[in-house]
Each structure stands twice: as C-alpha cells, then as structure tokens.
Amino acid sequence: MTDSHTAGPFIAAIDQGTTSSRCIVFDRDGRIVSVDQKEHEQIFPKPGWVEHDATEIWTNVQEVVAGAVEKAGITRDDIKAIGITNQRETTLVWDKNTGEPVHNAIVWQDTRTDALCKELGRNVGQDRFRRETGLPLASYFAGPKARWLLDNVDGLRERAEAGDLLFGTMDTWVIWNLTGGVNGGKHVTDVTNASRTMLMNLHTMAWDEKIAESIGVPMQMLPEIRSSAEVYGEITGGRLGELLGGIPVASALGDQQAALFGQTCFSEGETKSTYGTGTFMVMNTGDKLINSYSGLLTTVGYKIGDQDTVYALEGSIAVTGSLVQWMRDQMGLISTAAEIETLALTVEDNGGAYFVPAFSGLFAPYWRSDARGVIAGLTRYVTKAHLARAVLEATAWQTREIADAMTKDSGVELTALKVDGGMTSNNLLMQTLADFVDAPVVRPMVAETTCLGAAYAAGLAVGFWNSTDDLRANWRRAAEWTPRMDADIRDREYKSWLKAVERTMGWLEDEE
C-alpha cells in the first residue's frame, strides 16, 4: 500500500476524460491511495472534427482500474463501491447485441453539427429548446451529434428504430460494459449527463419526447435516467469481473458537476471553477431552476438518490490553459508552461495590453462564433513580459465576466471561489483572480476534485459516508488568496478589457 496511515475500506472512481482515462482509489478521509492513468488517441478526420475510439477507451478503463487496485495493494473486499465521472456530451451509438460501436464517439469539441444546429434553430433561433433544456442550440451538446450519426451512417436509422442500437454519453458506455455489456449490461445515465444531451426536460427530469422528435433521435435508443448516486448494478464479467466482480457501480456525474461535488459546494451560491485547457465555472443554485439571460447554461448540479435535484448555472470559457500552451508551442515566448508566471512577475502590470483569446469564437457569456483573437492596446512600450501578464489576466477577466453573469442571473453575490485544475499551481494567476473577481480564491488539498466527487457520490450511495456533512469535514484548504487591488484601478482595467472584447466580434463574415 502506498500510504502507511491508510487502512481500508476504500472507494474507487473512474474518470473517463477527454485525453485519458484514470482510476483513483480514495480512503475514508478523501485522500488519494493510488492512481493509474492511460491516454487514448485523439482522432481528427477533418478540420473541426474530433473523435475517440470507444473500444480503445473501454480497454483503457479496464486497465487503469486493475492498475489502481494493484498499486494500492488491495482486493475486491477492500472496495465498497466504484463511481464514474466523464467528459460530458461526447456521443456514442453501439449495437446492443454485439456491443460494437457503429462509429467512433463524436467528442464534445467536435463542430460537425454546426449546420444542423443552425437548421434546427432556423425560424426561432438558438434558444428554441432553452426553456425546457437550459441549453442553447450549439454543436457542443449530444442530441444533435446522435442525429448526425443516424443521418450519416448507412442503415443506422432503421436499426435504431428496430431497437437494435443504444445511445449514450461516456458514462453510459462505461456503466453498460462494467455491468455485463451484451450479457445484461445496465443501459443508464445520470441526471447531470442527461442534462447535456439537449433531450432532457429540466422541469420533469425525463426525456422530452417532443424535443427528441424535433431533433430526430428515436426514444428507444435512450438510456434510463437515474440519480447521480445510487447502485446501478455490479461489476460482472470480463477482465474486471474476475478481479472485482460484485462491487457496486454506484455513481455517475459529468466531470464539471463531479468537481462541484468534490469541492463540497453543497449550499446555494457556492461556486467552483476548474482551470484546465478551458475553464468551467459552476454555481450551485439549490432547488431553483434559474433561466439565464446572461449567456450561462442552466444545468443539473447533482441528485443524490431520492433527494431533490440540485440545479446549477454554468459558464464555460473556451481558451485558458491552452493560451499558455500557445505562447509556448506556437510563439516560443516561453519554454515551459510554468515560465509564464516567472516572466509575468518581471513587470508590474500589463503595460496597457489586453489579450482576448477568441481562437474559436467566444463562449460564455457571449456565445459568438464569429469572434477571433485580438491583442489590443499595443505600443512600443509593451514587452513579452507584459504579454505574459496579459495572458494570465485574460483568464482572470473571463472568470470575472462569468461571475458577473452569475450574480445577475441568480441575485447571489460570489463570497468565495473554490478552484481546481492544472492552472491553479500558478500563484500569480490565483492572486489576479482574487483581485479581479473581488472575492477570496481557495484551493483545496486534494486537487483531483473530479474523481473525488464521483467517489463521494458512490460512497454516499452505499453508506460509506452518511451525509454531505461527513464530506464537508474532509475538505481541507491548501491555499487562499484575498483581493489586494484598488477598486478604482479594477474598474478602469475591466472597462479596457470589455473594449478589447468588443474588438474581437464580427471578424468572420457569414459566408466564411
């Protein structure tokens, strides 16, 4: 065992992510006992298209679960349940009799359904299904991806209508395989993943037949919608059946919702922000379903067993960590990602430069696909160190815009922001965040909040933890940054940022 003070029992969590799958074993204090991880191939058949091989992913999931258990030096008797968290919206259709995918999974970033989404919104605009689903018509969501497969793979629609095919996001694929696959695998999804298909009605928490018909997805393909924390079935069959047969599969949450749960944001108004390639900020809105008029998504936060559904508001930023990578790989201004902080610290401010990284348009709160990146305010005075600072400030200003939108929609002021993800190791960025959103920024001890959230939900489902109070008691602060910026300077610079954002819009003309 990796940790001398850790005695069982344990909970395991699978994180089926965009670039890799991993499994983490946690103890009762929410501490990490072991980790195993394996990357899978990113497939780019055409510009704007992104696919994954779901068979490769299932193979990797089995490997990392076996690997994490082996590294922890434990057996099936030590593991009380396994939970699942996953990249959201990534869409798969498979044959229920053979277990074979009919096509690669279409990944959330894939934009091939742009034209279909425009067509679906033709007379009514992108808010056609927003009142029921909380989502704008965008290529991001799963329903239109399923329709694309049905329209473009030979014979698929007939097979779907005959009841031979199953649709699912990655949680559904993993659960179906874990619980037996063709031999009685459970075809289920949880409310958080279902809320990202554009096919679930947030008011009824059930599939919306009218919307499914409008989008063109047969109801018989869809999984059963369950809560985020309950026993869906047991591990059976296959490689893991021998190793871990009988262990309950007891939670599923989309990755951002899992991070909200892992950060113990259980009260209305509590908010977390995950800083990775892009950034996702999620606010718990309690039992209130808040329609956003400020460009946020209304979504499900989580649902524990038969307790009430907890809703959330979400704002997503397309480019944050990937802007630092761009500075390193395309511009050559830094040689490692960590260097951005060192370079930015050599100057006091941004030298008047503002960098809006609208590389593929702007996400929340604008949703403008015609925008492209801009560096504004350039003079001869500006050095690469000023640009490094402008790069970090871009992430902080975009967070501020979403925080403002959340306050506007919910009427709740942000009192603190819990953060996680790779970029949180950048202390200058964290201080800048606190300064710009004018609230304390807090980083927890366990950075793997996504996996932790799935483990927590699974543990609650089997009584490993009794209540969310137990989980709150586990949450430990590693670092906190408080605002140190003069309010007048903040307001002045925010104005300049908003001016720079305006300059990005309308760059692409319709015919492009």
UniProtKB/Swiss-Prot annotation:
Residues reported in the UniProt entry to bind ATP: 18-20, 277, 321, 325, 422
GO terms for cellular component: cytosol
Coiled coil ranges: none
Class in the EC hierarchy, top level: transferase
Pathway(s): Polyol metabolism; glycerol degradation via glycerol kinase pathway; sn-glycerol 3-phosphate from glycerol: step 1/1
EC number, UniProt record: 2.7.1.30
GO molecular function: ATP binding; glycerol kinase activity
UniProt activity-regulation remark: Inhibited by fructose 1,6-bisphosphate (FBP).
Signal peptide: none
Catalysed reactions, semicolon-separated: glycerol + ATP = sn-glycerol 3-phosphate + ADP + H(+)
Residues annotated as transmembrane: none
Membership in a protein family: Belongs to the FGGY kinase family.
Record's function text: Key enzyme in the regulation of glycerol uptake and metabolism. Catalyzes the phosphorylation of glycerol to yield sn-glycerol 3-phosphate.
NCBIfam families, sorted: glycerol_kin, PRK00047.1
Name by which UniProt lists this protein: Glycerol kinase 2
Binding sites annotated in the UniProt record for sn-glycerol 3-phosphate: 18, 88-89, 140, 255
Pfam families for this protein: FGGY_C, FGGY_N
Keyword terms, alphabetized: ATP-binding, Glycerol metabolism, Kinase, Nucleotide-binding, Transferase
HAMAP family the record matches: Glycerol_kin
Domain of life of the source: Bacteria
